[in-house]
Structures are given as structure tokens and as C-alpha cells.
Amino acid sequence: MAEEQARHVKNGLECIRALKAEPIGSLAVEEAMAAWSEISDNPGQDRATCKEEEAGSSGLSKPCLSAIGSTEGGAPRIRGQGSGESDDDAETLGIPSRNLQASSTGLQCYHVYDHSGEAVKGIQDADSIMVQSGLDGDSTLSGGDDESENSDVDIGEPDTEGYAITDRGSAPISMGFRASDVETAEGGEIHELLKLQSRGNNFPKLGKTLNVPPPPNPSRASTSETPIKKGTDARLASFGTEIASLLTGGATQCARKSPSEPSGPGAPAGNVPECVSNAALIQEWTPESGTTISPRSQNNEEGGDYYDDELFSDVQDIKTALAKIHEDNQKIISKLESLLLLKGEVESIKKQINRQNISISTLEGHLSSIMIAIPGLGKDPNDPTADVELNPDLKPIIGRDSGRALAEVLKKPVASRQLQGMTNGRTSSRGQLLKEFQLKPIGKKVSSAVGFVPDTGPASRSVIRSIIKSSRLEEDRKRYLMTLLDDIKGANDLAKFHQMLMKIIMK
């Protein structure tokens, strides 16, 4: 196939070089257009007239002339094929000449080649390809071999389905099919044609048979040295038209039991039928149809089973192991997240413990500095040489009982109080304090904790100044009150000033 395409490209390049070397003159173009116009205007003209007009074209090569079209039809026409030839071919193939003549106004030259590389003639356009009957597929129509070999049309271009035209071969088609119909006539239509041929029923016209060549050998297609098309890379072969609707698969392959334990609850499988290790492929096709099954189906039929049981079980085991690993990873991640939360809580607990330790240390410092002094005992500061010992109760303590150190402040001695308490059956802590330890009554004219009574002393003036400074009065009024306080001399005036100041502050 690659050699044929290279040969076609070479012929096209030669045609282009010939046109560049000897450009077509305007006179030759006008004569050619006039000849084609006469052919379209005179349907009864024979082939000889067409050949004479063709010979009259000065210096035009055959492949170059096939590209010249009529201005009236708007599309190129086939060289050397008049309406008379079209009528003859139409009558031979059983097609009415009226329809063929109506469709011949916009014909375009196409060339089709079979698998042997020989050109198939008798083509009008892509929508009405008619091929003469013949078993060898080498029928000849008008145009000659030179025209088909030197054509500048690229036959190797793939169609919309990715197959080249040379892969399709040549097949005489019945009168009800066109070229586009052959590409889409799959399945039931081809099957019906094959059934009619096998039963011996001939087509309406003699010599009309459907001969589909066998598919090309994949080994031959893969031997090309340089790839022609980038899509196939010259290593994939076309296997014809695949009829997927006529193929029926066999039994479904069974899967082996997985050795791993299922993660979820299982389902009963008592009603499951027994498995089938292998089943042959059921197909409905004949070797003469030209339709082949897919390469995968052929390899599976030759090799045996669709899947290797051991490989399939290994893949399933690997998938199960990966799923188990993923599940374990998810559990580990969840535990790590919980650990992170616990870490934050532990940090907060540590901070609280540190704060409590600081508070306890502060309390211990305060408790160690507490001293309870008991009056009446101790050394006289004026007589440091006295033989009086320190009171043992003079030590850091938190509290003491209410009866301790009362003997030193009462009038009666301790021995007499104990004897009297024993005779009465109870110990009495009541007694009269000595005069030196008794509190004197509070005087109303002297400053005490009960109230402030100003006098002419400097202490009273200092207290009044502190009251003025700590008040919420304005600065101007504070300065004014300070000036008045300095001017006051008597005790009565100072007492009145104090009363006035308290009224101003309390407002």
C-alpha cells in the first residue's frame, strides 16, 4: 500500500512539473472548454468525437486535462467520457439513462484501486460509482491505464473512519447501491446479499455478483519501513468493517474467591449457579462476507480464555491489599488527629498547674511572715541584761486558742484560778483585767478611728491637704482651697473649714 501511494504521489509531482515547464495557454483552455461545452450540449455525440476533441488540445497531457472543468457545470468532468458512454454503461448496469444524464452536470474524476494495485475504471463521481462485472476485478472502461496511473488525486488519504480507500478493494455492486451506500451497508444488508448468492438467486442483471476480498494480512501491513500516516504509524492494519451486532459472546468468566476477609457483612450465595471455565465465541458470519471480527476476539479464540485466571486473582488480591492499606491509613490519621487534640488539652492543663503552683508559693511566703505577739512577756528593751526568757508562743503560727496568755493580764494569779476552777468542776477563763491593760474611753474632742477632729497642729493641716488633693474637684478650686487653708489660724476656723470642705466634696 505504501508503494502504491508513493507511486501516485510521484505521478502527481510529474504532472505538476509538466504544467510548470509548459504552461497551458489561454487558447488551449478555451478550446478545451468549448469541447466540453459541445459534449454537454450534444448528448448523442459518440466517443470518437470526444477523442478527436481531446487530441485537438495542443500539448495537454492526459492527467492534466482531467482537471479542467466546464464553466457552465461548475465542476470538473471526466476526460474522454461523453453522455453516450454514460448511457451505454447505464444500460449495461440496469440504471435508467435519464437519471444518469441528470447527474452528469457536475461530475468529478475519482480513481479506485483494488488490492493488487490495478486501477478500476468506469467511475463517474463519488456518489454514483459503477463498476463492471468481472471475477478478477480488472475490468476496463474508458480512460486508459495512463490516466488512472498519472492521476493527481491522492488515493491514500483516509476517510472519516480512518481507513484508506485502497483497503476497501473493488466490488461490483448492484444497481441499488452507490459508493456511499457500500460504506454504510453493514450488518443485515450484506448478510441478505450473501444469503441470496448462496441460494443461487442471481441479481436482475447477469454478471452482477458481490465479491468482497479477504482482509489484508496484518504481518504484511507491519513490514513497511516508513510510516505514511501519523495516525496508524504504519504498524496497525485495517481489518475491514467490523460487524459487532452479529457477534454474541459466550458465558461470563467467573472470579475466584478473594483470600482476604471482607470488611462488611457478606451476602448468601447459595443460589449462584456453577461457574464455567471457558466458553466458545458464538458468531454469525461466513468467510465469504468479508466482515471480520475484532483482532481481540481472534486472539482470544486462538489463545484460549479471555482472561488469565491466575493473573486476575493476583490483581484482585493486590486491589484488596491496597484497600486494606488505605483503610489502615485512615484509622492512623484519625488517631493522630485525636492525639493532636489531646496535646492541646495537656498544654492547657500544664499552664493551669503552673499558675496554681505560683499561687501556693505566694501563700506560703505570706504565712511564713505571720508572727503573733503575746503581750506581757519578753525582754525589756530598756534592760537588755534581764534574765527573762522569750515567750515560747512568740513564733510563726496560724492561730491560737482563746485561753492562752490570759493569766498574764488578769488580776488573780494562775494557781488560785486553777484551784477555784477545780472546786467548781470547770475551768473558768473569766477574770478582771489589770488597769494598765484596760482600754480608756474614746474622747469626742480628740481624733481617733471613730472620726477626725482638726486642731491647730501640723498633722491636722496635713490631713486636710490630703483630703483636698484626693478629691475630684477642679484644679483651680483645689488651689483656691489650699490658699484658704494657709490663711486660717485658729482651731475653730479650721474646724469650720473642714466641715465646709466635706460638704463641697460630698455634693
Curated annotation (Swiss-Prot):
CDD domains linked: MEV_P-protein-C_like (cd21031)
Chain segments carrying region X domain (XD): 457-507
Low complexity bias locations: 133-143, 260-270
Annotated spans, Interaction with the nucleocapsid (N-RNA): 459-507
Compositionally skewed regions (Acidic residues) per UniProt: 144-160
Processing and modification events after translation: Phosphorylation on serines by host CK2 is necessary for the formation of viral factories.
Multimerization: annotated segments: 304-376
Gene3D superfamilies: 1.20.5.110, DNA helicase RuvA subunit, C-terminal domain
GO terms for biological process, alphabetical: DNA-templated transcription; viral genome replication
InterPro entries: P/V_Pprotein_paramyxoviral, Paramyxo_P/V_N, RNA_pol_Pprot-P_XD_paramyxovir
Interaction with the L polymerase: annotated segments: 361-377, 396-410
Modification sites for Phosphoserine: S86, S151
Keyword DNA-binding: no
Keyword Phosphoprotein: yes
Disordered as annotated region, ranges: 40-92, 133-168, 201-228, 252-273
Pfam families with a match to the protein in the record: Paramyx_P_V_C, Paramyxo_P_V_N
GO terms, molecular function: RNA binding; RNA-directed RNA polymerase activity
Region Interaction with N0, residue ranges: 1-48
Keywords noted in UniProt: Phosphoprotein, Viral RNA replication
Domains as described in the record: The N-terminus consists of a long intrinsically disordered tail. The central part contains the coiled-coil multimerization domain (MD or OD). Forms a four-stranded coiled coil structure. The C-terminus constitutes the alpha-helical X domain (XD) that binds to the nucleocapsid (N-RNA complex) and the L polymerase.
Sequence similarity: Belongs to the morbillivirus P protein family.
Subunit structure: Homotetramer. Interacts (via multimerization domain and XD domain) with polymerase L; this interaction forms the polymerase L-P complex. Interacts (via N-terminus) with N0 (via Ncore); this interaction allows P to chaperon N0 to avoid N polymerization and non-specific RNA binding before encapsidation. Interacts (via C-terminus) with N-RNA template (via Ntail); this interaction maintains the P/L complex anchored to the nucleocapsid template during the sequential transcription. Interacts (via C-terminus) with protein C this interaction allows C to associate with the ribonucleocapsid.
Purpose: Essential cofactor of the RNA polymerase L that plays a central role in the transcription and replication by forming the polymerase complex with RNA polymerase L and recruiting L to the genomic N-RNA template for RNA synthesis. Also plays a central role in the encapsidation of nascent RNA chains by forming the encapsidation complex with the nucleocapsid protein N (N-P complex). Acts as a chaperone for newly synthesized free N protein, so-called N0, allowing encapsidation of nascent RNA chains during replication.
The protein, known as: Phosphoprotein
Origin species: Measles virus (strain Ichinose-B95a) (MeV)
Source taxonomy: Viruses, Riboviria, Orthornavirae, Negarnaviricota, Haploviricotina
